[in-house]
């Protein structure tokens, strides 16, 4: 009895899981699909028991079709080929007749995508939880529930094997909280310092252990200055080579301030190899820092990539070329420092001004200027400023001295050295005075002789103040005020015809009785005419901007020349070019001026040739063996042996 009762109790329990499983599998279908109707959901529910049956026969519920398929794939292909058809075979049907569904589309792709709602075919699986979906758009909506859009990337619809890149999470493990947790469970243990990843929190950069993942990422650290694009560096390199070639061929006059400024203008907008160390073209790249290395944590275990070199400059072949180029650059520096236009634009030629350039020291040599941190002094010849004059680097420096070397005393560029030889004494003066010497304004010819007309500077100043253009300093209180205003004298005899009020003492005088003559006429114009005041203010602003632009351009030229000289000196110290190479090329060439600079290396080439001629003489004098004479050297025509 127990044996017969046991199967009787087990048989009724078999349909129970099937009846309960039907609504469980039918619930995702209407929630996952948006365009399916209620009839399509009912058809999917009715199809569930037949799918779970013992024979797994899936009947086609198309109107008038009784065919059954063993798998969902075959059923889907049957509906698409038999009932939907194709346009090429003239049997295209764009209306769904599955059960009571009458959905109509406009394209075949739309109707075939709609049929997936009815067919229990779920080829699209979720990589996080393993859930399958019928359509790719349903999977895309489901993936958004796992993480934020900024942290996930759903698999592509056409990816057939997504597990190759991101292995599926094994059953029984909790769902991932972000996109990369399940495939790198073994890697996350390396980041012991990082908290477990959560929503809306930054995560360390992951790295997949399988060979299908991406490699390490390296960030090259820049040092000092941005490298820029290689094309820009190549342009600057070529421009610098062309500039050195122009120096060798004397294409422009280094003594002309305009020519030097115009030639340097083409180099200021380019990226030149100017750094404190070697040129960036001759440096190797810094060691990259690896992010997320496989050795655990953030490591830098990557080999250093090799550096690259630019070809040598064609216009700088020998050491003599570098020396001569440095001499030309020094000459260009002196031209910029000694130019009258620059002196006038910098405000040195202002009346009574004593200017000392902050970045220069007065020297008696032709060496390049040395920079210092001292401030620029603009000292005026007045009594309160007399103490500041003593702090000048050169006590014997005359007034209106340009900010340059001591060549101003001998180059006839100083306006003081023209009309008098003892106005600005040289350095042999024993006891210099506390106050700077001022040039004597004798006549108009001597005044204008020191300043060329091109500079546009003011003539040498006399003992007048430096603020004569400011009216507020000319008129002080208690001076130039009239004792009796003219307006009051003209109106005092007029009869008062105004209506009297109750209190005559409280009557306020009219505006015509208020005399404005207490204000100086020179000052009243500025306060009464706002348009004139604004025009003056605008003109002053424009003048300041123009002067600032001139000063900025001058500073850029000075810095460019200093960087060029620093580059040349660095190449000379490196010793990459030997002087013997230049001597050999100059002596071996048929024309001695071919490899040398025109007008510069002529003396060195001649000296080298003379030295080469003298060497055979010295060798002949030191020979201890007898020399055989030729036949033509004998007077009798017979050759004789030496005695």
Swiss-Prot record:
Residues in C2H2-type zinc fingers: 58-83, 94-118, 124-146
One GO location term (cellular component): nucleus
Keywords of the record: Activator, Cytoplasm, DNA-binding, Metal-binding, Nucleus, Repeat, Repressor, Transcription, Transcription regulation, Zinc, Zinc-finger
Bias (Basic and acidic residues) ranges: 484-509, 611-620
PTM remark: Activated by C-terminal proteolytic cleavage by signaling protease (probably palB/RIM13) at neutral to alkaline ambient pH.
Molecular function in Gene Ontology: DNA binding; zinc ion binding
Coiled-coil residue spans: none
Subcellular location: Cytoplasm; Nucleus
Region (Disordered): 139-161, 354-373, 384-432, 452-509, 602-643
Primary localisation category: cytoplasm
A Pfam family of this chain: zf-C2H2
Gene3D superfamilies hit by this protein: Classic Zinc Finger (3.30.160.60)
Biased composition (Polar residues): 402-423
Domain of life: Eukaryota
Biological role stated in the UniProt entry: Transcription factor that mediates regulation of both acid- and alkaline-expressed genes in response to ambient pH. At alkaline ambient pH, activates transcription of alkaline-expressed genes (including PACC itself) and represses transcription of acid-expressed genes. Specifically recognizes and binds the consensus sequence 5'-GCCARG-3'.
Subunit structure comment from the entry: Binds to DNA.
Protein name in the entry: pH-response transcription factor pacC/RIM101
Lineage: Eukaryota, Fungi, Dikarya, Ascomycota, Pezizomycotina
